[in-house]
Design a protein with these regions (language model features):
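Glycine-/small-residue-enriched capping loops at alpha/beta junctions
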Residues: 1-111
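Phosphate/ribose-phosphate-bearing ligand recognition and processing surfaces
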Residues: 86-206
């Protein structure tokens, strides 16, 4: 746990959907992303918020690094903040996550959130970042946002149990500061992303 300006930042292994936050940042879920990881949890817990995002994405489209806010219909977590990072190239993903998280925090703050939960971003089957790199991007975004926060007073960063200590060390040692970009955390994200697209397009064969 660490205080950054007025915001308490906490590293937790609690399931993202079980965190009693006012708003939750989620990666944009498309294609096969909903069939694994936090995609299933969020879709089951906040189906209204996911359905609203699907409608918006089909009607208006979205650009990398942007964030879309949807209402969940829940009495506890009122908003999902959908960070559009899926499909970002390896070289730009760290910066894309950082930009999207900062935008998400601004939007959550504008909507009156006091408590925001954020998962690791860019680390899934279609991502390139390691958990450590994702943590640096998220914490860097929090540090840039914190001086301007009007409402947000707590941020929980949700990671796996095995990653808590290494991520907590990054937070305490402030190794995320002045970190502009990091690449090559994972090598297979591009192939997985291509596979997902081909499966959804009905292409029967995938070479690797």
């Amino acid at each position: 746990m660490k205080r950054i300006k007025k915001i308490i930042v906490n590293v937790t292994s609690v399931n993202l959907a079980a965190i009693d936050a006012d708003a939750i940042v989620v990666p944009e879920f498309q294609h096969c992303a909903l069939h694994s990881g936090i995609g299933i949890t969020i879709a089951k817990t906040y189906p209204e918020g996911m359905q609203k995002y699907d409608y918006y994405a089909k009607a208006a489209g979205s650009s990398l690094g942007s964030v879309v806010v949807t209402e969940t219909g829940s009495a506890t977590c009122k908003h999902l903040l959908h960070a559009v990072i899926l499909g970002c190239c390896r070289e730009d993903l760290f910066a894309c996550v950082k930009i999207a998280v900062e935008k998400a925090l601004v939007l959550a703050d504008e909507n009156g959130a006091l408590f925001v939960a954020i998962p690791t971003l860019g680390t899934g089957v279609a991502g390139y970042l390691s958990v450590e790199q994702s943590a640096k991007a998220v914490f860097a975004a929090v540090a840039e946002f914190a001086p301007f926060a009007k409402n947000i007073r707590r941020i929980d960063f949700a990671v796996s149990v095995s990653s808590v200590k290494v991520v907590e060390d990054i937070l305490q040692q402030e190794s995320y500061l002045d970190c502009e970009t990091e690449i090559d955390g994972k090598k297979f994200g591009e192939w997985i992303y291509t596979l997902c697209n081909q499966l959804n397009s009905g292409v029967p064969e995938v070479s690797c």
